[in-house]
Structures are given as C-alpha cells and as structure tokens.
Amino acid sequence: MKYLALAAAAAFSIIAPSVSHATTINITNYSFSTGSQDGLLHLTAGGPFNNTTPSFGQFKLTGTNVTAGNTPVTFFTYCVDLANALFVPGAFTVEPLSLLFSPTQATNMTKLLANVASPVTADQSAAMQLAMWEIAFDLSASQDVQSGGTQGDFWVTSGSSSTARTLANSYLANLTTWSVPAGGNAYLLYNAQNQSQIFFAAVAVPEAATWGMMIVGFGVVGATMRRRKQAYRLA
C-alpha cells in the first residue's frame, strides 16, 4: 500500500529493540502518537509538497528488524524528507545524519530531539515536526516557521497549527543554549526512494554485529494530506 505522507512528529521516548549501523528495518504500519494539526506548507525552492496542506504530528512506526531475525520493533520518528512519499511496507536502513545533512543541521536536530519533552498534546507534537522541518529545509539565516519568502525558506500558514507554530519557534530560539547530552545521538531511517525519518537513540548505536542494546526512539511519521473533499497522505 502506498501512502502519500509527510512524516511529522514530536519527541516521545520508548524502549525499542536493538538496532545498529547497517541494520535493515521493515516498517509495516504507522499512526499519530498524540494527535496532529494541519497547515499550508511553503517551500521557496519548490518541490512536491510546496503549497500542500498536510496534517502533522509525531508518528508511531511499527515493523520488524530484518537484520535481527525479524524482531518486532517500534519507533517514534520525524519526517526529514519532503521529496518522497512514504511507502508502507517499506525497508529502511539505520544511517548517520551526515548522509543527508550538514554538521550544523545534524547538531541542531539532535539538540531538538534531546531537549524537548515528550509530547502529550497534538500542538506539542506538531510543533516538534515543524521545528524539525525548519532546520532541514530553511536555508535562510532566520529560523521562523511563520515567515519566509527568500530562497530556501520554509514556513507554514493557516490551518489549525497556530499554537504549534508559535511553540515551534520557541524551540528554535533555544537551540543556541541547548546542548547534546553525552551518550545520545540522532539517526536516520533511510531509503532513497522512500520518505526518510529521524529518531533519537539514548546510547550510541553499535556496529551491525553488536546486539542487545535498547534505544529510545523519537519520530515523526506520515501526515495526512488534506484538501477539503479529498484526503491523501504524505510521509
């Protein structure tokens, strides 16, 4: 089954089965973990999701760890890819953020995941995804999810996400003072033809031959693209 989905999520921790670099994860299902909000997305650089109105919030991804003998796994992830739709089921590999992002982007994404409390409302969940998209796709000097217009800008207007947009900007404003905790890092669930996701691991992800580690997963999962009479998903 193919879902046009924009993965969106806010930080939420779980204890998940072991994963490692080069681990293959097969995702078979997803849902919003704490609800969602919607808004009109703008990307000055264009792309398939420019001027679309998805719902966004933290996603709960479930599936199996293929490398570990199809052990059941659960991740909470955020979308970091607005160029691909999410296909479920779909296979992903665990990769470093450097595969897609600059050192500054990777650091800020990790700070965001490590310092924002687990969401308990739809606004908190949506705010986390918006802040993640701002880091990933806004290349302007000012990070503000509510304004834009220069090349590389990302911003959001209208919809039910007004509170989430304000909250997202408060997260972004704290990036200069937040730090990355020792022993934790963010990683990608990556597929070049599928929609890549980001999650946070409380301890370093070991090499492929090392098992038995528990991680804390964070994430965004696909958002429901909504038009008034037609719904379709991005993720």
For each feature predicted by the language model, list its residue ranges.
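C-terminal membrane-anchoring or membrane-association module
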Residues: 222-235
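Short, surface-exposed polybasic-aromatic patches that bind anionic ligands, especially phosphate groups
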Residues: 23-202
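Enrichment for repetitive, rod-forming helical segments
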Residues: 9, 136, 233-235
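Sequence-pattern detector for short linear motifs
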Residues: 5, 168, 229-231
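Short, threonine-centered small-residue motifs that mark membrane-proximal processing/anchoring sites
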Residues: 2-8, 12-24, 196-225
